[in-house]
């Protein structure tokens, strides 16, 4: 081959590779529910699910952030000790609509090994931004339930038999926990990306109105969808930064629940209040409270992981919580010395923390007349969790340019890059 022909061949190979890369689908995380290990009957809170299912269908609603021409669904057996057999699964574009069968390597059923998860094959179902989908999963054999998401803030249903392709369920019972489904990804333009919010019950939406998508991450998703940015929640009620709580510690699950999400470009960290306040309560009677230095080291570790992956990481100050959880088994959750540690941590986050930017949620939610308390207009009533108005105020307190690194101010078109 002469020199000219070599150059032509090289150019053609390069063009072929570029075309292949350009045609590869760009997947973005559009919805998430972080998995948790199921706890025993002796725990402070009921699990809200049966110990096992056998020949049952589980149906749940998930409002995605961004839409696209195709989607795929992630099912999890993260904490299972035996294989999870799925006999069928489907997605319906809305409640009462005809479900579309999901496939896994071309088959309607799938076996998920212990500690594993599986992505479905891409489903050619065009969905819109902020669309509420219904996902159904059928388990044909006796299946101990060992992985769930406890605080779904959404009604789900358990029905006998294989009803995964039924428009309406027959003889269904309700729960607010989630099973099997941990993520929905959409095919999107190459400019689309996602923001993951890792946190505890405040991010999980513990007191948000049921079935109304009023978590603070829902409000943030509504702000960012027009810019082609999805928001997915990695909140776990009872979650902690340094130690396992009602789920793995944020340090342990950060890669899985945040950095490994497709299309992630920024992460928001709002976690730590349970680290400060659980010790000495019914949750952790004999545990020592972490020091300021230990909490700082935990935040630095998260920031280091994110930066090594080229992901922007934004911290959030811990909101006020004076008088939290009155009249409950956790009415000692708040103590003045715990609040002093929160204030020290917030001061450090504002001035010397390891994050690329900081969202001052403490300032956004506090009562100006009593800064240790949440403003009444934002308080759900338990003095720890914001209500719907408080969740909206949190989302509105986010500087989008700071969150996205100044790369998210242009309107977004779904036709771009597909």
Regions found by a protein language model. Give the residues of each.
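Bacterial N-terminal signal peptides that target proteins for export
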Residues: 1-8
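N-terminal secretory targeting modules
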Residues: 3, 21-198, 208-211, 405-407, ...
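N-terminal signal peptide c-region/cleavage motif recognized by signal peptidases
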Residues: 16-20
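Conserved SGNH/GDSL esterase-like catalytic core that processes O-acyl groups on lipids
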Residues: 31, 52-60, 75, 83, ...
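Active-site flanking residues adjacent to catalytic metal/cofactor-binding acidic residues
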Residues: 198-200, 316, 359
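Catalytic His-Asp segment of secreted/periplasmic serine-dependent ester chemistry enzymes
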Residues: 251, 277, 319-412
């Amino acid at each position: 081959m002469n020199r000219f022909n070599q150059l032509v061949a090289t150019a053609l190979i390069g063009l072929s590779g570029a075309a292949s890369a350009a045609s590869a689908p760009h997947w973005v995380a559009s919805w998430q529910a972080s998995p948790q290990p199921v706890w025993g009957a002796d725990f402070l809170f009921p699990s809200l699910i049966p110990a096992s299912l056998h020949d049952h269908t589980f149906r749940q609603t998930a409002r995605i952030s961004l839409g696209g021409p195709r989607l795929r669904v992630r099912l999890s057996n993260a904490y299972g000790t035996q294989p999870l057999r799925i006999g069928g699964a489907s997605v319906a574009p809305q409640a009462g609509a005809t479900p579309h069968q999901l496939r896994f390597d071309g088959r309607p059923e799938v076996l998920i090994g212990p500690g594993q998860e599986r992505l479905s094959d891409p489903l050619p179902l065009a969905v819109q931004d902020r669309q509420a989908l219904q996902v159904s999963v059928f388990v044909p054999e006796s299946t101990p339930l060992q992985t769930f998401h406890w605080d779904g803030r959404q009604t789900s249903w358990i029905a006998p038999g294989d009803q995964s392709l039924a428009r309406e369920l027959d003889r269904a019972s309700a729960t607010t926990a989630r099973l099997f489904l941990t993520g929905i990804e959409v095919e999107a333009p190459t400019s689309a990306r996602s923001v993951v919010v890792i946190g505890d019950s405040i991010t999980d939406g513990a007191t948000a109105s049921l079935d109304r998508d009023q978590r603070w991450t829902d409000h943030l998703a509504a702000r960012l969808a027009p810019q082609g940015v999805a928001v997915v929640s990695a909140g776990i009620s009872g979650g902690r930064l340094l130690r396992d709580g009602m789920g793995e510690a944020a340090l342990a699950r950060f890669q899985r629940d945040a950095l490994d999400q497709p299309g992630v470009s920024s992460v928001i960290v709002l976690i730590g209040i349970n680290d400060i306040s659980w010790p000495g309560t019914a949750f952790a009677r004999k545990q020592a409270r972490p020091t300021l230095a230990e909490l700082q080291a935990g935040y630095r570790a998260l920031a280091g992981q994110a930066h090594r992956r080229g992901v922007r990481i934004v911290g959030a100050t811990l909101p006020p919580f004076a008088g939290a959880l009155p009249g409950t088994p956790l009415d000692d959750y708040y103590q003045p010395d715990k609040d002093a540690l929160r204030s020290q941590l917030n001061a450090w986050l504002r001035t010397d923390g390891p994050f690329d930017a900081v969202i001052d949620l403490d300032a956004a939610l506090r009562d100006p007349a009593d800064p240790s308390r949440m403003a009444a207009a934002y308080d759900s009533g338990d003095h720890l969790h914001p209500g719907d108005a408080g969740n909206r105020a949190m989302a509105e307190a986010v500087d989008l340019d700071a969150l996205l690194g100044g790369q998210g101010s242009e309107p977004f078109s779904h036709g771009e890059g597909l």
